[in-house]
């Protein structure tokens, strides 16, 4: 088994979700994060423009069997890419064991 963690633009989340469902990856977790990087984002607050290095992104966490790894990576790459700096990163790690918790 593999764990895929993808950090993507929040605006690309729906596209990535559709791409994952299309390849039958139907369950994953996600959460919103704020990071700091080289990329600057412009904001307007009460009519005043300012720039910050705080970057809003969404992290997806997916645990899949080995045969789903390549299609999952390709689906995320195609759906999340804008061709610009800051599109995100994908990390893959091995999962030794998984246990189901039931009541």
Positions of PLM-derived features:
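Positively charged, small/polar-rich N-terminal and surface patches that mediate targeting and assembly
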Residues: 1-103
């Amino acid at each position: 088994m593999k764990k895929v963690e993808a950090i993507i633009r929040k605006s690309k989340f729906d596209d990535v979700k559709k791409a994952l469902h299309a390849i039958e990856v139907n369950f994953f977790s996600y959460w919103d994060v704020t990071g700091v990087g080289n990329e600057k984002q412009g904001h307007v607050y009460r009519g005043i423009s300012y720039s910050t290095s705080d970057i809003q992104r969404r992290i997806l966490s997916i645990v899949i069997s080995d045969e789903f790894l390549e299609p999952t990576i390709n689906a995320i790459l195609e759906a999340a890419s804008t061709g610009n700096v800051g599109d995100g990163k994908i990390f893959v790690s091995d999962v030794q064991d998984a246990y189901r918790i039931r009541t």
